[in-house]
Regions:
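Phosphate/dinucleotide-binding and metal-coordinating scaffold of catalytic cores
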Residues: 2-3, 10-349
Length: 349
């Protein structure tokens, strides 16, 4: 009986088959990488031209930050899961929640948040570190990303002369809107240089029992900010941002201007700002040049020139020197370093 044998492929055919498989594998890998690059490039253009400033802008920007390769991503993820940030509980009535929700709806319909919507304040209570405080709550921010989903940005004012962590006014925002840890680093650097800085930390926020996630808690302007920087109480103003009367914007103006001595100080600094703008006096008669130089150096290092826009650039009038000192605020650090020329990501540093 004959046993039929199958023809075995030659060694040459086996080698060629393996080469073909390797080529197909590399072709698939190359095609995948090329496809991802094209999608990322087109997506970047779409973000820059359409999404930036929309309710999806911060999500899209975060995609690029989250998916940048990092050898520490696993350890950082584990550390994040095991962390236990302070918890801050906000409670308000259903009616007050609906008042804010109505403002959010109007803002989303329009595409941005107006001053009218931000002027609607509601009563609430905050539980933090066992203590309970009565507060006023309103929306904050101008771009729609401040109210995307349920993670709204808030401005908090503590009532009855009370404070939370030493602050009577502060903001709560999604960390994405303050560029995650970058703003915290910026504020720490200002502290290191003995410049006026804000208290800044991360907390877990709950609203009426619902977990909203991690928020950036950022101190806002009032006398306690100045006291925390070991300075004497003084005016806080935006020298280049004019109010309806054509005068520099003054924080807490209705309260400050009731004090005759503070009103006199405000009028004097208005005159000096006007003289400086008309080039009648040098900058050294209006600004603390040494501290201003340090501040601008730090801001440039971090790419934080967004804080120099007239509506963001705030100064403290030191009653001892009678000079303006910059306050680091809303610097938008590290989001657009290439645009602002920030140095911390430069290949030469």
């Amino acid at each position: 009986m004959w046993i039929k044998t199958t023809d075995r492929p030659s060694l040459t055919k086996v080698v060629l088959s393996h080469i073909a498989n390797i080529r197909m594998r590399y072709y698939f890998i190359f095609s995948t990488i090329f496809f991802i690059a094209i999608i990322s490039g087109v997506g970047g253009i779409y973000y820059g031209t359409t999404l930036m400033g929309s309710s999806y802008g911060s999500i899209f920007a975060s995609f690029y930050r989250y998916f940048r390769p990092s050898l520490n991503i696993i350890s950082h993820t584990i550390q994040g899961i095991r962390s236990s940030p302070d918890r801050l509980y906000i409670d308000m009535s259903h009616l007050d929640y609906e008042k804010l929700s109505h403002q959010v709806f109007n803002a989303k319909e329009r595409g941005f948040i107006t001053q009218d919507e931000k002027s609607v304040e509601v009563n609430a209570s905050i539980r933090y570190n066992v203590e309970e405080h009565n507060v006023k709550v309103r929306l904050r921010g101008s771009f729609i990303e401040h109210v995307r989903d349920d993670k709204w940005s808030f401005r908090i004012k503590v009532k009855n002369g009370s404070t939370i962590d030493g602050m009577s006014r502060f903001s709560l925002s999604s960390p994405e809107l303050r560029n995650h840890i970058h703003e915290w680093l910026f504020q720490r650097n200002l502290m290191y240089e003995n410049l006026i800085n804000l208290r800044y930390k991360f907390v877990q926020v709950y609203l009426n029992g619902k977990k909203l996630g991690i928020y950036a808690l950022e101190e806002f302007f009032d006398k306690r900010l100045i006291e925390n920087n070991n300075m004497r109480e003084g005016l806080i103003l935006r020298p280049d941002d004019l109010n309806e009367e054509g005068k520099p914007f003054l924080y807490q103006a209705s309260k400050i201007l009731k004090d005759s001595s503070k009103q006199a100080a405000y009028n004097k600094v208005i005159d000096r700002i006007d003289e400086y703008k008309r080039m009648k006096v040098p900058a050294s008669t209006l600004y603390d040049v040494t501290k201003s130089a340090k501040y601008f150096a730090v801001a440039t290092l971090y790419g934080g020139q967004h804080g120099h826009l007239k509506e963001n650039y705030a100064c403290y009038l030191n009653p001892v020197t009678n000079l303006l000192e910059p306050i680091g605020y809303d610097s938008n650090v590290s989001r657009v370093l290439s645009r602002y020329g920030g140095m911390i990501e430069s290949p030469n540093n």
